[in-house]
Amino acid sequence: MAPAQTSLLAKLDTQERVRDFLTNAIANGRASHAYLFLGAPGAGKLDAAWALAQAFLCERDGCGSCDSCVRVARHTHPDVHYYTPESATGYLIAQTRELLDDVPLAPIRAKAKVYIIDRAEQLRANTANALLKTLEEPPEGVMFILLGTSADVMLPTIVSRCQCVPFRLVSPVVAAQAVSRATGQDPARCRMAVAVAGSPTRGIEFLKSAERQDARRQMVRAIDSLIAADEADVLSRAKSLIVAVKAPLAEVKSTQEKVLEQNADYLSRGALKQLEDRNKRELNARERSGIMEALASARTLMRDVLLTLQDEAADVVNEDVRDTIGRLAAATNVAGATQALEAVATAERNIARNVTPQLAIEVMLFDIRKALKCR
């Protein structure tokens, strides 16, 4: 007999107030039609959004084990729509139009629908204005969850139409302890997982994914090899990294294709097109998330190199690759490690601006190679 699954809301143990508030809202039938989750990166806003979506769509308030809950947990439920900005300057009008066209359509599997809008501060006035009426009076059974860093950088007209939920900043130690409790793994490894994945919930998922851990290993090896690498080696490493990052997407794509096949006979052509567009967005978002996770692996590694240059006994995040950290520290100096960190930051900005992932990785690796040799 398979073990009972825990709901995503119950797993939000680093944001107890948020967890209890949302759990009570669902249990008492008082869930708002529009939420605005506010907090610093890494506070767990996106994890909470998926958790709330799971509870809202479940007929048992988020049991964690029914078909709907499992699909939401795997990010494959066709009635949960996740949006992230598709241009360097923010959300496109076409994205807003697509969302508004989808809102009146009936749900595909559940009795309700959820729209998660990440980095909502990047909703520009011309795109946000189109959302206002729908945010204020959405159809019954539709929930919006917007994610942002601060109400101060959001359009006031958006903030006023949402129920704001503040998230406190979670310390790395507390986050690592939460992951260790959930997985039973060594606290040092859990600390690394949180640093790379970005939050406790995603850290737990990272430690369960051999493919995501392999992508991290590939990034560490790529940087470790840069001192002696020629141009062909760098390009080959970048290509291998992209392949590793995309590896977890195969299962997602297969699941999406099965859902399309199951619904092909009774959905209209327009509804199928909406589902195909949603699947494409989901794959793009997952690829971007994987790239950012790989870049976080590079960032934490080079940060550890910089700390080691300043103090050989420094407390590093990547304890399992301390030998690599030592080799890189021996090959460069503080200026070189700092330049390498700047190269990673540039790559992260480029990915946020929708630069081609392989190009962003190639440029970063060449820049890190140059930085490491500046000694």
Label every PLM stretch briefly.
Residues 1-126, 133-136:
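Clamp-loader machinery-focused feature within the broader ASCE/P-loop NTPase space
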Residues 1-54, 68-71, 140-142, 149-297, ...:
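Charged, glycine-rich active-site and insertion segments that engage polyanionic ligands
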Residues 115-118, 131, 142-148:
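Structural recognition of the conserved hydrophobic beta-strand(s) that form the central parallel beta-sheet
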